[in-house]
Each structure stands twice: as C-alpha cells, then as structure tokens.
Amino acid sequence: MSRSVFAILLVLVSACGREGRTAATAGAQRLVDLSHEYAADSIFWPTAEGFKLDVVSDGMTPQGYYYAANNFSGAEHGGTHLDAPVHFAKGRMSVEQIPVDQLVGPASVIDVSSKAAGTPDYQLTVAELQAWEQAHGPITGSIVLVRTDYSKRWPDAERYLGTTERGDAAVAKLHFPGIHPDAARWLAERHVKAVGIDTASIDYGQSKLFETHRALYDKNIPGLENLANLDQLPATGATLVALPMKIKGGSGAPLRAIAMLPR
C-alpha cells in the first residue's frame, strides 16, 4: 500500500472515530457518499437479477433478546458497483486482484450534465477531455468521474434507463449518456486509475459492442457505475475512495464509494 493511500485511510479512521461528529463533517475533511443504497427498487441491467433481501430473523428470541439477520442476493452488476476489467477483457483483473491503490486517488470530475439533460444518448468526447485538461491540468493518474446528473433520476427506471421493461428485448430500448470509445481510448493512453459515471454504464445506452468497456478494461482500468452525488464534487480537489466487496473471481461487485473534500 502506498504512503498516500495509507495517509488517506488514517484520516478516514480518525474522522469516523471522533465522538460527537458525523461522518459527513468529521475532522478536517468533508465526506460525500457517492453510492445509492441497495433496495428492492435498485436499478439493475434489464437482463440481470435484481437485489433481494430475505428476512431470516427479526424479533425476540426464546432467550429473551432481540435478533435480526437477512440473506441477500443479486447480480454483480447493479446498483452502485465496480466493474472489474475481466468483465469485458479475458485474462484481466478480477475484483480481488485490483490493487487498493488503484481505487483511491484524486478525482477528476467532468461535468457534461447540461448536454446530457437534453440528449439521452450523449457521449463524452475527446475534445471535452482535452478542454478539461486545458482548464484544470493533466488528468493522468487520477480517477475520472463523468457527471451527467442522471443519478437524480434514481430509482425511476423509465427516466434513468429509458425503459422499465426487463429481459433481452429491453436492452435495445436503453437510452442514457455514456463515454465515447475514442474518449475511453484517450483516457487509457493517459493511464488513469479508474473511470466512473452516474449512469447505468460507461458505454451509452444504445451501445451494441461495448467498445468503451473493452478499451478501458483491456488496459486493466476498472469502471465505477451508477454513482451518486457527483454534483457535490468540484472539478478537482476531491479524493475518491471506491472499495468494492472483495469477491474472489468476481467480474464486478457492490461498491461503497466516498469522496473526501477539504472543509
């Protein structure tokens, strides 16, 4: 683990352990939760099994104490989650193989919300990334987050995905913004740590070949999908911590992502 990541984790432990302070305002950092909660209405890919929580126990035991426990199930790729590179690139990293250092780092937030609002099939372009670099500096080595503000539509599947239908036929009816494959290749050349977005996929809804996934994952760059609250982050200055459930051999996993900002 690098010294920078260790220092960030020390700040988190210190912030969360101070009595009388909330996690969102503790210490010298302000924390922003970038994950949707998992629930029965969480949005999953139309062909994927949704989230299910089965109650095992919820009540008083014969011994006189209260006890609650549940079983949960669902596809890897739904809700706020991480895509491991192996999801679209044979032989690349599965979830447990991704170094922690790659999931913690400076966030570069690309705001395309105004364009995405009126164009459901909008795709982030290379020109926009180049313009962002001219304004804010090199993007190399950061975690790139694409803000469309589609997270504000969650959990309304009709507005978020373009359809409430399920099954194979529903995939052709998906409409939401994503990242153009040329932009993905441009990011891969700059060795970014990971790429995230506040929509259901880093590829736009009408993608048939998932070229954006393939371009990034072939270079072992993970994806973060269905993020939330990116509107609360500045273009630069936030540190992202994106830690998935550590599933051995997983092509993806549920994700709790947070951003740390100076107060």
List where the protein language model places each region:
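Bacterial N-terminal signal peptides that target proteins for export
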Residues: 1-6
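Active-/binding-site microenvironments in catalytic and ligand-binding cores
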Residues: 17-263
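Residue-level signal for mature regions of secreted extracellular proteins and peptides
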Residues: 9-10
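C-terminal motif of bacterial Sec signal peptides marking the signal peptidase cleavage site
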Residues: 13-15
